[in-house]
């Protein structure tokens, strides 16, 4: 008689859960998806996307808040279409992202265009589309945008991205609000930059913007940044400059391991208190969440190829790799790893979960206790954000397929690449 296996609770519960000993995405077996569609495979839950967006709606209540999904986290068209249908705007950082928004019927009047390196052609495309505003990140960019807009006979709506020099206490690669980061205009220089903007042709000032980082799980960094922005609004008002909105960026963290995620309602209640007390309660608030909307709405499913014991380490070699999910390699990020169909009564071994790419840094997880055999499927959790969007073809590996589950049904929302497709883009000298 086998001992019943104790099943963990996935971080994406209830949208990812075990049923009859097998991990499911909503009503669909993850093992079935892997059998039918192959691995590596990204699996998204439509219900999880809606639940994450609803958490923001509850926190917003009747206030004037525009949620602009930070689509760099996951720009699959099916994901974008869901947020567009829910009424979201979009935070973009390239013309390509704008074209994705337009392709799914997103409202360009709800699009904010961020990014430090906007090209003139991108500015023209955004002006023609009628985006809500440009989050301008430097004075040279401001001058270029003025020239482009003036030449087109248009007025570019701008919000200057201010760098408040606030430490978000997160990984340095995803910290964006310190003075040594490349993003934004130093807050001490912002009043002069706004005066410059006010004098330029083709420019209409509409907002103030900041974004201090990502995977933040405390309110204090957000509120510190907000206080500095409100002080800036006071200075701008003294210069006769008024703004329509205050853009607080994104950055709310999610649970990867044992973190306590910051609920949107908890942050927003504090934000509303602050802006009301300072007399800016009538201003629209813009938010740019990305990870908190999609991170725990996705899994990366992979197949075990080999179990390789060595004197120093036991390696569990899978068919997914750093080219599929680079976060562990790039940030030493933690992702939970689950057996899709845990083996009852079998002793677990401790493994580093590694891929087939020819790099020592190709790993997905380290020192994980798993009871598995060759051919079993594993699910890498919290893979809905910064997963497929950061994938590459390193080692001439075609990128994974993506599937979205909706109740008891699933839809392939990105076909698996083929080597033939990769080779078709290249040519030789004859």
Report the location of each language-model feature:
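Charged (often Lys/Glu-rich) extended helix/loop segments that serve as interaction or gating elements
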Residues: 270, 280-430
């Amino acid at each position: 008689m086998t001992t019943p296996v104790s099943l963990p609770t996935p971080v994406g519960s209830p949208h990812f859960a075990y049923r009859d000993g097998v991990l499911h995405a909503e009503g669909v077996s993850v093992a079935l998806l892997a059998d039918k569609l192959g691995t590596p495979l990204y699996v998204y839950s439509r219900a999880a996307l809606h639940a994450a967006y609803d958490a923001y709606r509850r926190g917003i209540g009747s206030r004037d808040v525009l949620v602009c999904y930070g689509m760099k986290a996951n720009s699959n068209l099916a994901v974008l279409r869901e947020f567009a249908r829910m009424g979201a705007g979009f935070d973009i950082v390239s013309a390509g992202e704008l074209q994705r928004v337009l392709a799914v019927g997103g409202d360009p009047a709800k699009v904010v265009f961020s990014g430090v390196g906007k090209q003139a052609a991108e500015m023209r495309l955004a002006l023609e589309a009628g985006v809500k505003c440009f989050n301008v990140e430097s004075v040279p960019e401001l001058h270029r945008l003025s020239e482009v807009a003036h030449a087109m006979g248009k007025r570019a709506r701008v919000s200057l991205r201010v760098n408040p020099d606030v430490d978000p206490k997160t990984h340095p690669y995803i910290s964006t609000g310190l003075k040594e980061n490349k993003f934004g205009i130093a807050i001490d220089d912002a009043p002069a930059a706004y005066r410059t903007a006010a004098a330029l042709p083709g420019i209409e000032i509409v907002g103030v913007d900041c974004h201090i980082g990502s995977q933040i799980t405390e309110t204090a960094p957000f509120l510190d940044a907000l206080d500095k922005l409100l002080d800036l609004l006071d200075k701008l008002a003294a210069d006769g400059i008024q703004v329509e909105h205050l853009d607080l960026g994104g950055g709310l963290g999610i649970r990867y391991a044992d973190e306590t995620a910051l609920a949107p309602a908890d942050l927003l209640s504090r934000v509303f208190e602050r802006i009301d007390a300072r007399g800016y309660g009538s201003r629209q608030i813009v938010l740019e969440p990305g990870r908190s909307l999609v991170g725990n709405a996705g899994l990366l499913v992979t197949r075990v190829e080999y179990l390789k014991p060595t004197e120093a380490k036991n390696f569990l070699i899978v068919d997914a790799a750093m080219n599929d999910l680079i976060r562990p390699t790039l940030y030493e990020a933690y992702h939970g790893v689950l057996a899709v169909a845990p083996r009852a009564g079998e002793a677990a071994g401790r493994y580093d979960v590694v891929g087939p790419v020819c790099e020592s840094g190709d790993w997905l997880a380290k020192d994980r206790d798993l009871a598995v055999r060759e051919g079993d499927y594993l699910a890498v959790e919290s893979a809905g954000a910064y997963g497929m969007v950061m994938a590459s073809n390193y080692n001439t590996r075609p990128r994974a397929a993506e599937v979205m589950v909706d109740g008891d049904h699933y839809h392939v929302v990105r076909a698996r690449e083929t080597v033939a497709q990769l080779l078709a883009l290249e040519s030789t000298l004859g």
